[in-house]
C-alpha cells in the first residue's frame, strides 16, 4: 500500500470511528436520593449501542416529583399529560447530555408505558 492510500485509509477510519461514538446522556432516577436527579445529577455516561436518544421523564403525583433521566432506543414525544393525581411529562433529544434541561412533555399513548417505569 502506498503512503497516500495508507494516509487516506487512516483518516477515513478515524473519521468513521468518531462518527459512530455512542451518545452520552444523564442517567439517574429520584429513587437514588430525594434531590438526586431533580436538580443535581451525575456526569453524563455513555449509552449502549442503538440507544440514540436521551430522555427525561417527570411524574408528579399528589405533590411528589419523580424524575428518570436515561438513554432510549426510541424518541418520546415532547408532551405532558394530566393524570388523576398529577401529570407525566417526557422529553427526548439526540445530542450528548441534552436531557439535563427543564423542558419536557408526554402524550396519552405513552402513558401506559411510562406508568410501568414507576
Curated annotation (Swiss-Prot):
Compartment(s) of residence: Secreted
Disulfide bonds: none
SUPFAM superfamilies reported for this sequence: Snake toxin-like
Free-text tissue specificity from the UniProt record: Expressed by the venom gland.
Stretches that traverse the bilayer: none
Post-translational modification: Contains 5 disulfide bonds.
Record keywords, A-Z: Disulfide bond, Secreted, Signal, Toxin
Residue runs in coiled coils: none
Molecular function per GO: toxin activity
Transferase as UniProt keyword: no
GO CC annotation terms, alphabetical: extracellular region
InterPro entries in the cross-refs: Snake_toxin-like_sf (IPR045860)
Signal peptide start-end: 1-22
Miscellaneous information on this protein: The scoloptoxin-05 family has remarkable similarities with the three-finger toxin family commonly found in snakes.
UniProt record similarity statement: Belongs to the scoloptoxin-05 family.
Protein name (database record): U-scoloptoxin(05)-Cw1a
Organism this protein belongs to: Cormocephalus westwoodi
Amino acid at each position: 500500500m502506498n503512503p497516500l492510500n495508507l494516509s487516506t485509509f487512516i483518516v477515513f477510519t478515524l473519521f468513521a470511528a468518531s462518527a459512530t461514538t455512542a451518545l452520552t446522556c444523564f442517567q439517574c432516577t429520584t429513587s437514588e436520593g430525594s434531590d438526586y436527579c431533580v436538580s443535581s445529577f451525575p456526569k453524563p455516561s455513555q449509552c449502549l449501542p442503538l440507544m440514540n436518544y436521551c430522555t427525561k421523564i417527570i411524574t408528579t403525583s399528589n405533590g411528589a416529583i419523580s424524575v428518570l433521566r436515561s438513554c432510549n432506543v426510541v424518541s418520546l414525544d415532547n408532551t405532558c399529560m394530566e393524570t388523576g393525581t398529577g401529570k407525566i411529562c417526557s422529553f427526548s433529544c439526540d445530542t450528548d447530555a441534552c436531557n439535563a434541561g427543564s423542558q419536557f412533555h408526554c402524550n396519552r399513548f405513552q402513558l401506559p408505558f411510562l406508568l410501568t417505569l414507576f
